[in-house]
Every structure is written in structure tokens, then in C-alpha cells.
Amino acid sequence: MRKIGLAWQIFIGLILGIIVGAIFYGNPKVAAYLQPIGDIFLRLIKMIVIPIVISSLVVGVASVGDLKKLGKLGGKTIIYFEIITTIAIVVGLLAANIFQPGAGVNMKSLEKTDIQSYVDTTNEVQHHSMVETFVNIVPKNIFESLSTGDMLPIIFFSVMFGLGVAAIGEKGKPVLQFFQGTAEAMFYVTNQIMKFAPFGVFALIGVTVSKFGVESLIPLSKLVIVVYATMLFFIFAVLGGVAKLFGINIFHIIKILKDELILAYSTASSETVLPRIMDKMEKFGCPKAITSFVIPTGYSFNLDGSTLYQALAAIFIAQLYGIDMSVSQQISLLLVLMVTSKGIAGVPGVSFVVLLATLGTVGIPVEGLAFIAGIDRILDMARTAVNVIGNSLAAIIMSKWEGQYNEEKGKQYLAELQQSA
């Protein structure tokens, strides 16, 4: 009997979760029984992310051993991220202006959701300027950064440590072997944890559907449709077009990442697939030094789906209140989002926090966010999938840009996937 692939297992878990959540809609016992299962799965993933990032980066950087080369890669990566996320903001603004998802919506028919936790988080984040964000990339205590899961300081430390290992030559070989062994062991652990993924997805989706009110979705159905349609357009037209410029087929990337996309979509967490997409991009021909740097950094600076949604949601709320935003106001919104959407990936409910920090500066009532908070989970699932594709593509593009992409390895990996399909 043929073994069912992971993508199908996760998909079955997703469907069963929807069915169970729908049958027991409004029953608090669903959350009581299933939430712990979902939480355990998410905690297992979070447990392995930092060890994988550190070990992979140290090994990758030590193999390069050149600060000038790494600086060049870092500069190119940030430029690419800024260009793509700016395009995402423009696409979100255009979609909101063309399709007018907030026009004609009766605010009295909408349910308000408590967003106080997001407000509190925003107040904490807003104390940090863009300059402080860059200053905080350098950790004053690496163990503090490790305990809080602050990814940018961890990446910075790992790069510096990898350069140090390379600089001491023969003396550094035992250290390098230790981190190589750690990386391999952690990828093995990842594969074992992924066997639990269908159960984690079943539990998380079951809880979401059991709590989610259809009555809150109907008045906002146009927003949901516009968001999903725009996300699909961004994947196939924008990312697909960029991929083609570099000789990459976007459908090949989607085929490679099918397991990860279903998992990221179901859990609304791109962190759940970080170790797997690093591993797969390496198998697809990207060098470890580039995948281990570009993909984790992208989680802070290249959230394409999130930035697109933030632009679209901002205009939606303006339309909801009957505010007609001028071109100059929308350009101001674009410029503000270019800054506020960067460097706070570790913050819970990052898209909401960015919107809370942004709306007031361009004259849009922040209270409007309470109307869309109830359906945020459904929208979050879509933007998470886009984030995963965007960061995976970034690793391939940077590998090609640096002239380090292994075409033969990539073709061989694709052929292996087609044979096993």
C-alpha cells in the first residue's frame, strides 16, 4: 500500500479540524481538549528554530569566512527586501482603491473585538525608533536574546561567531564539526516533529472554527475575497514575474513547498516551517551560507503578505469611515509602512501592531481595527502562505545574484520530487 504523503496528511487534518469545529461550534470544551495539542505542536517547532538557525549560520558563515562577501550579501538582501515589500504595499493600495472592499459596508452590522492586547504591544514597540531597531540588532547579552527568541541579534551573533571560527583555522575545526553535527541532529528532530503536524493542524483548526462566528464573516466577506484574490495575484504575477527574471519557475517553488504551505496556512505561523524551508532551499541548490542568513532575516524584513495586507486593511478602514484618502495621503501611508513593517517579526499579532502604529499617523481611526480583528485569523492564514513563498524565493534569488546557485543540484532535487509524486 502506498504511503500517504505529509501534504495529504496535513490536508486531512485540516479538513477533519474544520468538520469537528463546525459540529461543536460554540462549545468551549473543544478549546479545552484541542488547544493543548495545538500548543504542544507550536512549542515543539519553536524549540528547534533557534538551534537550527544558529548552527546553520555558524557552519555557513565559517565556510565563507569573508566579512566583505557577507557584507555584500547583506546589502543586496536588504535592498531586495525593500523593493519587494514596497511593491507589496503598492499592490495592496491599488487593490483597495480598485475593488473598494470597505465601501457601502454598514458599520452597525459589524461586531467589535477587543484589541487591548494589541494596543499594549504597540505602545511597547512604538518606543523604538528605526535607529533603535538597528542598534538592537547588536545584542548586549546573547543569552537574553536567546531566551526571548529575538532573531535579529541571534543572527548577528551567529555571523560574528562563524567569522571567528573561520579566522582561527585548524583550532576552529572541532567547533565547526560540533555545529555541523548540531545542524544535522536538529534537522532530524524537525522531521520527527513533522510527523505530529497533522494532529497539530487538526487541533488548531478545530479550535479556530469552533470559536469563529459566521455572522462576523458575512458583512466582511468582500474584504476576505479581495485579500485572498490580491494575495494570489501577488504570488503569481509579482513573485512569479520576479522569479522569471532570474530564470526560476514559481510553480516549481510551490511544488517543492507544498507540505510547508499547507502547514503554514493551517497554523497561520510561518515559524512552523522555517527549519523545513531552509533545508529544502539548500537541497534545491542554494548554499547553506545564503539560506541560513536570508530566510531568518526575511522573517523580520521581508513579510510580503503582511505588508500587502497592512496597506489594503488601512484603506479598507478609511473606506469604512467614509474617509476619501488623497494620493498624497496614500503616499504618506506607503512611506510610513515601509518603516513600521520592518524588524518586529517576533511581536505577537505583528500585522495588527503595525497597523495600530501606522493608522493614526495618516488620519485613519485606529478603532476601526476592532471591526476586522474577529476575522484576522482567516486573513492571517493567507498572508502567512505568501510570506513563506516570498522568503523561499528570496533565498534562491540571492544565491543566483551571488553566482552560487547550483543548477544541477536544483534540477536533480526537482526530478526526485516528481518521481516520488
Swiss-Prot record:
SUPFAM superfamilies reported in the protein's UniProt record: Proton glutamate symport protein
InterPro entries reported for this sequence: Na-dicarboxylate_symporter, Na-dicarboxylate_symporter_CS, Na:dicarbo_symporter_sf
A Gene Ontology cellular-component term: plasma membrane
Taxonomic source organism: Bacillus caldotenax
Function: This carrier protein is part of the Na(+)-dependent, binding-protein-independent glutamate-aspartate transport system.
All ranges on the Cytoplasmic side of the membrane: 1-3, 65-77, 170-198, 244, 328-330, 373-421
Location (main, coarse): membrane
Cited Pfam families: SDF (PF00375)
Similarity remark: Belongs to the dicarboxylate/amino acid:cation symporter (DAACS) (TC 2.A.23) family.
Protein name: Proton/sodium-glutamate symport protein
Keywords: Cell membrane, Membrane, Symport, Transmembrane, Transmembrane helix, Transport
Compartments where located: Cell membrane
Domain of life: Bacteria
